[in-house]
Amino acid sequence: SIWTIKRVWQDTHWYVTYREISGVKKALFYKVCSSSPDIKQCIYDLKNAIQKAQKLCDTIGYHGFEEDFQEAHRLLNDTDRLDNVLNGALSACVFAGMGSWNDEVAAICEDKNIPQHQYTEVTNALFSAILNVVCGICSY
């Protein structure tokens, strides 16, 4: 996968694109972030998104990301150090690759008849919150 984070100074936004490496370059996710987000709000939103992801995992009986989410929470509680905040966001990033959120949790949700919108809502909230924290740190 390829991540591109680009700041366009004229309109004060970050443009984040996530692409899969293949013959066809197809953007899987595209987000525009404010170049001056409130980092404390971003951290709060990420903590909430992690809690929702943990709740979904508990609902489906999957605990493969439990340590990742616990480590993310631990690091996000030390907001005096931006490196801890960044590492917390990266610990919460359970996307891409075999055995990732996109593979495991998506498949189990489908098997357990969890509504697609519920999985999508939790996934988008977590992914967006991670990106917002990263953009917030880059703008700090």
Segments (PLM) and residue ranges:
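Alpha-helical oligomerization segments
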Residues: E67, E71-Y140
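Residue-identity detector for threonine
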Residues: T4, T12, T17, T59, ...
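Proteins with a high burden of low-complexity, intrinsically disordered sequence enriched in S/T/G/P/A and R
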Residues: I2-D11, T59, G97-M98, C109
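Extended, non-transmembrane interaction/recognition domains
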Residues: S1-I39
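Conserved binding-pocket/active-site segment within a compact domain
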Residues: K31-A89
